[in-house]
């Protein structure tokens, strides 16, 4: 089974987060070799969602978690760039060691006091995981799955194509990332916060 790795606010509202250094608009993907999928987008949040490692030059190393109610940061958070706690990092690396890019980032609270050392998570599996025979979607220009002009659209993942992967980006989809049911189950069993897994259709 396949799940979308979504992030939810733990206390009913999204917290404003401010980069304190770096320049997210200038972050670039390291290897931009075409692979038949989506073109590689640099800057803002694009580079961090392409399924390949990013250059470190402009990645922030300090962020402010501006929660006036002073709640802790969940294990999974999506502010600017998907970021995780050390607990979440260790669990992911238990399944896929030395695969993904974990970039250290220090968070402070609204008063500027140290809050937590965390990790930007750059997913580094970029695969084609959609089942073409069972999906009712259009592969626009042979590059991106879209439901535009499709009657009763349906996206179905291939368990065969995703076999052996636990965390990935699909090279033909603008959303994601996606995770295996095994990893989703462990995240929930360990009680990691901020995670909201949505089960996707798969065959």
Regions found by a protein language model. Give the residues of each.
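Phosphate/anion-contacting hairpin/loop surfaces
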Residues: 1-203
